[in-house]
Every structure is written in structure tokens, then in C-alpha cells.
Regions:
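A short, proline-enriched helix->beta-strand linker immediately N-terminal to the Walker B motif
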Residues: 156-160
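Conserved ABC ATPase "signature" region
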Residues: 113-132, 185
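ABC ATPase "signature
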Residues: 222-223, 231
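Helix-to-loop junction immediately C-terminal to a conserved catalytic motif
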Residues: 53
């Protein structure tokens, strides 16, 4: 039995102009783990996520999801099994919160009663009142509320894997900290396999069981927060750790 929930096997992604977004990536994570993916703009973080949900294909190598090569899985069906939270929440502005959250269950053919039960449960799970929120539109909510709805939508069909692309990056510090607390509470309860992209080292250390550090399309280090703080593997990681300590101090 394959022990990995997600694997990237010797993957490179080259664009038509010859530049590489990712080079020789060998990476894996186990079921129920939260992996924080950190790097500067242009480091390959977004390409990494897009490979996982088959929005793009690798130039070489293979992406393996739950033991099966992604290239052998129908991309539409695959994405419906992967929860996804984009940076801006990605809610449809002219749909109600109910319509947004119930989208994937509806596409999967769930009975309406089951969809509504799931809606109530998930909104409550992310600390929103279903009776007050369900019929409202995204523009009527605060930024923090919209991100909570985006998380609820990503979990709607109970996917085993959830991808989060800078989910808290556009929020004020107080709301960001509150949603980080909510994320930790949800993960302790649900034990999903989570890939969280961030540019914030403190957020990566707080939310990730392990951390993958990218620079210019190459993995610099993968390890627990303690492993990275205690033994930076490259000069770049050492610099990040120095900045982290300076910011905290």
C-alpha cells in the first residue's frame, strides 16, 4: 500500500520560453499532514499547486495522488475530490453563500436535503451562523467572513485533500490570527491532508506539521519547524531563519 497521500516524482516544469518554474522536484507527504509551502514570488509555489490539481501538466516526471498517477485520473473528477481555497476566496459574487458552498455537492448529484445539511454543518464549523449567512452574497460579508466561507466550500464534498493558496494573506493581522486559530482547530478535528502556500515564515511554522521551502523552482529544505530552525540546510534557509528570529525579536 502506498504510504503517501501526495507525491511528486522527479518533476520539472518548463515553459515555452525555456525557463523552468520547477526543477527536479522529489517530494511527498502523508495522509492527515499539513505541509506549508513557502517561498518568494517566482519561487514556484503556484506552479506546485497547479500541478497537484492538474491545472497544468509536468514537462517531465509524475504527480501521484493517493497512490495513482494524476495523469491517469480524469482532471474534472480529480478537482472535485480536492478542496481548493484561492488567495481571494474565489467566491462567485452573484451567487448566495448557500449556492457557493453547495456547488461541488450539487455537481456530484447530492440530494438537496443532504446539501443543506452539509451547508449548515460547515458554516457552523467555521463559526458562521447559517441562518444569518446562507442567503447573503459575498459582497455583504467582511473579508474574514468570505475566507471562512471559502474554507467551508473547499470542505463541502468532504475531500481527503485540501489545497490553500495564501488563504489569509489579504487579511488584517487580527483577522489573520483568528483564522489561523480556526484553521488549527479544524485540522485537529478533521485530519485532512493540507497543502498551505504562504510567504509568511511565522505562519508556516505555526500551521505546518512540516515545511517545504522553495527558491527559484528548487526545493531548499523539507522538515518540521524545529528541524528547519535547528539545522537550516542551505544558506537561503539560514537567511530565512535569521529573518524569522529578527522579526520575532
Amino acid at each position: 500500500m502506498n504510504p503517501w497521500a501526495l507525491e511528486i516524482q522527479q518533476v520539472s516544469k518548463q515553459f515555452p520560453d525555456g525557463t523552468y518554474a520547477l526543477q527536479n522536484i522529489e517530494w511527498s507527504m502523508t495522509e492527515g499532514e499539513t505541509m506549508a509551502l513557502i517561498g518568494e514570488s517566482g519561487s514556484g509555489k503556484t506552479t506546485f499547486l497547479r500541478l497537484l490539481n492538474r491545472l497544468i501538466e509536468p514537462t517531465t516526471g509524475a504527480v501521484v495522488i493517493q497512490g495513482k498517477p494524476a495523469c491517469l485520473q480524469d482532471p474534472i473528477q480529480l478537482r472535485r475530490r480536492l478542496g481548493y481555497v484561492p488567495q481571494d476566496g474565489g467566491l462567485f459574487p452573484h451567487w448566495t453563500i448557500k449556492q457557493n458552498v453547495c456547488l461541488v455537492p450539487h455537481l456530484l448529484g447530492w440530494p438537496l436535503e443532504q446539501q443543506l445539511e452539509r451547508l449548515d454543518r460547515l458554516l457552523s464549523l467555521v463559526n458562521l451562523n447559517p441562518s444569518q449567512i446562507a442567503e447573503r452574497y459575498p459582497i455583504e460579508l467582511s473579508g474574514g467572513q468570505r475566507q471562512r466561507v471559502a474554507v467551508a466550500r473547499a470542505l463541502a464534498a468532504d475531500p481527503p485533500i485540501v489545497l490553500l493558496d495564501e488563504p489569509f494573506g489579504a487579511l488584517d493581522p487580527l483577522t489573520r490570527h483568528d483564522l489561523q486559530d480556526q484553521f488549527l482547530s479544524l485540522q485537529a478535528r478533521l485530519q485532512k491532508t493540507m497543502v498551505l502556500v504562504t510567504h509568511d515564515m511565522s505562519e508556516a511554522f505555526r500551521l505546518g506539521n512540516r515545511i517545504t521551502i522553495l527558491k527559484e523552482g528548487c526545493i531548499q529544505q523539507v522538515g518540521t519547524p524545529h528541524q528547519i530552525l535547528d539545522a537550516p540546510a542551505t544558506p537561503y534557509v539560514h537567511l530565512l531563519v535569521q529573518h524569522f528570529h529578527a522579526h520575532r525579536g
